């Protein structure tokens, strides 16, 4: 509700306008190489999807409790996945809004014991056992009903204005109880869904650098590094809205205590605004360079300042993210790689195609390219398309490039690479010849090299669209199920190189 939407959905046309606003944002994020989107899904005990527990937030329709006429979470998931980006449902955990607001009023009717009032604001009480179960209910509802890639917990801590009367150790145990309840609820359902949070940007005081009283571990009882160590969380987005000595030592601390999990520090790019702290771009760009050196990602808060190109941050990121990047694999959850794709071919109009794997789980594909063979998929600079859900991608107009494709499962684990063959390793007597076909059987051409290789036959129409693929078995190919017309025959080598054998005509 902060950066989107900018208009209310109250009629069919306004629904379309609201959707177009989100699409425009996602298009810009995709162009800049963003691979994860955190979408605020539970706002203040209110939601952007139809929930059995909590009312609609008013940011979509303009009226709290009123449906906008569509499921915003489902729409956003589809649009992110279409662009090769993960979508994580951002769940604000403890704050529930104004005491008399729609979300808090609903909770007061359900279970007043879970709530604590501070001024005119309401909060779920982390010290009450029911709180952990209730937030887990919300997260389970999202994971069961939506194809999210992650659950992201915001404000999973004691509020700064809460008079904490328990010991810090007890306080951390209460917050961790909530985290564990969510973990134990969602992981049996979809173990590949990442559980993450946005802790305070400084975990604790360091030996040489102080947090000046504002840290995750002691001040607000977040044992975030412990959550990584104990396997309760897969990823952290520490809110590192600082600079200089308040940033770099603490970023290194997060890196050194990641326990093999993913750490993606959040950068306070809103401070670039003249209305905020008017930071120069160099503060953020330097932080991005250092984070990359330490193998950490970066997240931007907020997206509006990014897509508005405040102080040139968007333009800088376009150059900084010169090639796509993959989210690190969840090897601690599963290290089993999917089978590699087959039948890699570069067709007309520079469209690279491959045969998708038949599998019970969701599989994505990553495409790599380089001027040398084989393509080195360990070099991130060779990645040209990530998390492709289909089996085709348009590549650059260059006959000097080689390509490779990997399959990737929901854990982010990649298969081995299907590589293009070096050019010119198969030959046919006359690739422009008319092949003999009686309308049902196609007589295959002879090439001594083919009989010694594991190749696949590919039949395309005159526009280059695949019509049939088959293993090369014997001296004929069954084309009885193909409609009459003119077709081209190719062989695809085991590494994906396409060689033209000729064309044939089916008449019946």
Each model region followed by its residue ranges:
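Catalytic domains of carbohydrate-active enzymes, especially glycoside hydrolases
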Residues: 20-46, 145-150
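Beta-strand-rich modules
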Residues: 395-414
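Pro/Thr/Ser/Gly-rich low-complexity, intrinsically disordered linker/stalk tracts
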Residues: 313-361, 411-427
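Substrate-binding cleft of secreted/luminal carbohydrate-active enzymes
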Residues: 224-225, 229-247, 264-333
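Aromatic-lined carbohydrate-recognition surfaces of secreted/lumenal glycan-active proteins
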Residues: 86-98, 152-153, 171-217, 263-272
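Recognizes extended acidic, P/S/T-rich segments that occur
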Residues: 364-398
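C-terminal tail/sorting-segment detector
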Residues: 426-429, 443-445, 484-508
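Active-site-adjacent "subsite" loops/lids of carbohydrate-active enzymes
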Residues: 1-19, 73-78, 88-145
